[in-house]
Each structure stands twice: as structure tokens, then as C-alpha cells.
Regions:
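Short amphipathic
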Residues: 20-22, 26, 66-67, 139-141, ...
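Solvent-exposed alpha-helices and their adjacent loops that cap or buttress functional pockets
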Residues: 46-48, 59-60, 78-82, 95, ...
Length: 376
């Protein structure tokens, strides 16, 4: 039997450094696989920040200017101004040749073809070409996570296909003859954890307890980067996964010092990791939350510090744990109090109603009072 930490270390040896391109609209949350270097100046022209009149600042000794043109945002009309002249400019419009100052419209008065400037102000109200981003500038670094803010930088540069680290494909198989009579829960819950962690779940269907059927399903699943199964890893006659993994590849560990989830098995087939979760729904979910996020997030170059974070709470009751086993206790949080929800590893509501888990270490047997809750 292996500790949780040792099992995690073994699984973290698997890596993935595959890169791909995704459309800009699909890049949110992905990790950049290369530096983003601007190929253009942004803005690409001297741009007005205000509605008003563009003039030459050296002409400010006079307060009356002759209106010689209009510039609108998106327009392609070219205007040049000389001594004592001005041009109307809209916000976002190109600055006319010769102008270096925009007087806000509220500080002026138009009289016929003339414009009177009452108060020019202290700011030029012009965004110069390249003041936001310059051609050749590295604007985002490799390893940066695309978020709701810097995705705007990519859009401003006109980037339509974004270089990112590829998501690992994760094959999911539930095993057991009983799945012909009951609903398959584990495939659904595991796929949600995979997606939340940054992977791409691939449903492979269910397998019966016939060893040939299980082998066929797993061989088919080796097209993916990771294989996950549930069921068939305890000590019953139909618990075939240890045999199947040994014959198709090799077992890395079997049984982990944790509850729930102790029967957990991991191996390697065709250089691909295979994680065999317990069939009991809460045990399966706990193993999924413990082992999948750190492994998958490493593969997509995302940081991992617990997906939901940690909250401090007070246990509603004293909890007894088995010495030498790390216990993951599902709890519901209400007004700073953590109420245990565990009713049995085979019952989905044991974790389905939980907001997080309290981890009780291998050296502890009793836990009470203030605790850290790993939010799910």
C-alpha cells in the first residue's frame, strides 16, 4: 500500500508538451505556448481621444480658427491644416496632418465657418501611434493564462488563431455488469472533473465484467493521452482491472492509504497513464478530485493550488479517523460551520451535497474544532 503523496509523485512523472492553435474565441483559460509579439502599432495612427477640433498648438495665440475639414472614426478622408486652421475630429478619428492638439468641443463655439476656442486645456487629447503597443514588442509571455483582460490584447492585435498548450484527451470507461441495470454515474462525474481540470473528456462507454471486453475497451482508449476506469479493482472474482493492466502494460501502484478510495490503482499502457478508480461513487469522486486535477493541470501548464481554494470553518462534530490512513471527509459549509455529509462510499449524496472536503492526516485519529476545508 502506498501513501497519497507517493502516489501523486508517481502520477506527476507523466507529462505532455503538445502545442496547438485555437480560435481566439476559444482561447479563454488556455495557456500560451509561445510569446506574443506585436506585428503592428496600436493604435496604428495618431488618434483623437475626444470630440472636438484639431489645431496646431503654435497657433494658440489666436483664438479664432478657420474650419477646413471633418475627420470621423473609420473614415478614410485625408485632411491637412495650416496656420490658423482647424478640423473637426470625432473620438477615434485620425488626426489631420499638421495638427498636434485637440480642443474638446465643449470648450469651443462654431460661428459660420469659424471656430472660437475659449479654453484649449492642458492635455493634447491625442493617442499617438504605438502608444498602446509597438510593432516588435513582446506583449504577452509564453506560459501566460488567457483571461478576460488580456484576451483583449490578442483581439487588438488582430490575432485570430492563438498558440496554446494542447489539452490532454482523457478516455473514461465505467466497468461492471451492473451498469446494464443501473445508471452510470462515474463516467459523468469523472468527465466533469477532467473538464474542470483543463482536460478533454472522451466517453468510451461501459464495459462488462468479461476480461476480453475490458481489454478491448482499454486498447481502444490508448488513442487518448490518459485512461480512466471505474470499478473492478477490489478483491472480488469480477475485479479484473489489476489483471488487465498487468497484461496490457504494468501496474505502478495498487491500494492507497486513503479513505474513501483505498482500492485505487494506477498503471501504464503504451506509455500512457491509466488510473483505475473504485466503483463506489463517492470513492470514485474523491479519488478523482485528489489525483486528476494536479496531473492534468501540469500537462496543460496550469498552476495547481486546489481548484476551489481553502476556507476556514469549524467542524460541527468530533470526527474519528483510522491511524495511518488519510481521510477525505466531505462537508457542507453553512455560516462558517462544516457539517459532515458522508453516509457511505457507495452513496452519491455523501459527496453530492458537499461543498468541500476536510483532510485528516495519516498521523491524526481525531479531528475537531477549526479546520481547513478544501472547496470543491
Amino acid at each position: 500500500m502506498i501513501t497519497v503523496d507517493d502516489a501523486t509523485e508517481i502520477l506527476n512523472r507523466f507529462s505532455l508538451d503538445r502545442r496547438t492553435y485555437v480560435e481566439l474565441k476559444d482561447s479563454f483559460g488556455r495557456v500560451l505556448a509561445e510569446d506574443i509579439v506585436s506585428e503592428i502599432d496600436v493604435p496604428s495612427f495618431d488618434r483623437s481621444d475626444m470630440d472636438g477640433y484639431a489645431i496646431r498648438d503654435q497657433d494658440l495665440d489666436g483664438r479664432r480658427f478657420k474650419l477646413v475639414g471633418e475627420m470621423h472614426a473609420g473614415g478614410d478622408l485625408e485632411v491637412a491644416i495650416g496656420e490658423g486652421e482647424c478640423s473637426w475630429v470625432a473620438t477615434g478619428a485620425n488626426i489631420p496632418d499638421g495638427a498636434n492638439l485637440v480642443v474638446p468641443v465643449e470648450n469651443t463655439e462654431k460661428i459660420g465657418d469659424d471656430v472660437i476656442v475659449y479654453e484649449p486645456g492642458k492635455e493634447p487629447h491625442i493617442s499617438e501611434r504605438g502608444c498602446d503597443m509597438k510593432q516588435g514588442e513582446t506583449v504577452l509571455k509564453m506560459g501566460c493564462i488567457v483571461n478576460d483582460r488580456n484576451i483583449g490584447i490578442l483581439a487588438a492585435l488582430g490575432i485570430r488563431n492563438v498558440p496554446v498548450y494542447d489539452m490532454p484527451t482523457v478516455a473514461i470507461i465505467s466497468t461492471g455488469d451492473e451498469l446494464a441495470r443501473i445508471n452510470d454515474v462515474n463516467s459523468i462525474t469523472l468527465s466533469a472533473i477532467v473538464a474542470q481540470s483543463g482536460g478533454s473528456p472522451v466517453f468510451m462507454g461501459t464495459a462488462t465484467d468479461e476480461i476480453s471486453h475490458v481489454k478491448h475497451k482499454i486498447k481502444e482508449a490508448t488513442k487518448c493521452d490518459i485512461i480512466i476506469t471505474s470499478g473492478g479493482i477490489s478483491s472480488g472474482k469480477k475485479d479484473l482491472m489489476p489483471i488487465v493492466v498487468s497484461e496490457l502494460g504494468g501496474v505502478l501502484f495498487h491500494r492507497v492509504k486513503m479513505r474513501p478510495g483505498m482500492p485505487m490503482l494506477a498503471g501504464m499502457i503504451d506509455e500512457k497513464p491509466i488510473l483505475c478508480m473504485p466503483g463506489n461513487v463517492t470513492s470514485c469522486l474523491v479519488c478523482g478530485h485528489v489525483f486528476l486535477p494536479p496531473m492534468i493541470r501540469r500537462m496543460v501548464h496550469l498552476p495547481f493550488a486546489g481548484l476551489g481554494g481553502v476556507r476556514r470553518a469549524r467542524l460541527s462534530e468530533e470526527v474519528v479517523s483510522e491511524y495511518g490512513m488519510r481521510r477525505y471527509l466531505p462537508v457542507k459549509l453553512v455560516d462558517g460551520v462544516a457539517y459532515p455529509t458522508f453516509k457511505g462510499s457507495s452513496l452519491i449524496t455523501s459527496i453530492g451535497h458537499a461543498d468541500g472536503m476536510v483532510v485528516i492526516g495519516e498521523e491524526e485519529t481525531i479531528r475537531k474544532g477549526e479546520v481547513d476545508v478544501q472547496v470543491l
